[in-house]
From Swiss-Prot:
Keywords: Cell membrane, GTP-binding, Lipoprotein, Membrane, Methylation, Nucleotide-binding, Prenylation. Residues 221-223 form a propeptide. The keyword Metal-binding does not apply. This is Rho-related protein racE. Gene3D superfamilies: P-loop containing nucleotide triphosphate hydrolases. Belongs to the small GTPase superfamily. Rho family. Specifically required for cytokinesis. The gene is racE. It comes from Dictyostelium discoideum. One of its GO terms (cellular component) is lipid droplet. One of its GO terms (biological process) is cortical cytoskeleton organization.
């Protein structure tokens, strides 16, 4: 985390990892652009920027999206240097993505950036609530909140939070928690100038922008 050159805002670099199809990109687009995309646009890596207020202070959050597919395993670590916090994402309707947190994602993050705090995030909770057992394929067993907390303890993540990008349930809470963890780790957890002690979910006025490419992303790859 650092001061954004020329803006005076505090910079937070947030990296999101997890299996393909857990909804990482939709999560970032909904937070940064206040929009739930429906079109599929394949990408490997994308950056977004969102600015939030914390009292009188601007927090500029640089969001780094990564591909979860195995063929990008050698490229993905390029996203890690300079990270302040990591979101480890799994789908609450995918047992395999949940197990991959323990077997792949937490070990990978701990290898490349062992001192960076992480938050475990269970996505697609709107679909978890809609799922019903299929008598032809066996009983459907979604990932419960208790299972998420258990995994959080196993991998020593700072928090476990659940979210739906589509309904926005838990969306601001996830990113506000990430911001606060970073600020606390830098000794900036005291009350800010106007007495507020948490990052607001309301944009500070800057229109959120995407990082590398100049075009606004219109679609969502379910990474």
């Amino acid at each position: 985390m650092s001061e954004d050159q020329g803006s005076g805002a505090t910079r937070v670099k947030l990296v999101v990892v997890g299996d393909g199809a857990v909804g990482k990109t939709c999560l970032l687009i909904c937070y940064a652009q206040n929009d739930f995309p429906v079109d599929y646009v394949p990408t490997v890596f994308e950056n977004y920027t969102a600015t939030r207020k914390r009292g009188n202070e601007d927090i500029k959050v640089h969001l780094w999206d990564t591909a979860g597919q195995e063929e990008y395993d050698r490229l993905r670590p390029l996203s890690y240097p300079g990270a302040d916090v990591v979101l480890l994402c799994f789908s609450t309707i995918s047992q395999s993505s949940y197990e991959a947190i323990r077997d792949k994602w937490a070990p990978e993050v701990n290898h490349y950036i062992p001192d960076v705090p992480s938050i475990l995030v269970g996505t697609k909770i709107d679909l978890r609530e809609q799922q019903h057992p299929d008598p032809n394929s066996g009983k459907f067993e979604p990932i419960t909140a208790d299972m998420g907390i258990s995994m959080q303890k196993q991998i020593k993540a700072k928090k476990y939070l659940e979210v739906s990008a589509k309904t926005r349930q838990g969306l601001e809470e996830v990113f506000s928690a990430a911001i606060e963890i970073v600020l606390e780790s830098r000794g900036m957890d005291k009350k800010s100038q106007d007495g507020s002690s948490s990052a607001s979910g309301v944009p500070s006025g800057d229109k959120p922008t995407k990082g590398k490419a100049g075009k606004k992303k219109s679609g969502c790859i379910i990474l």
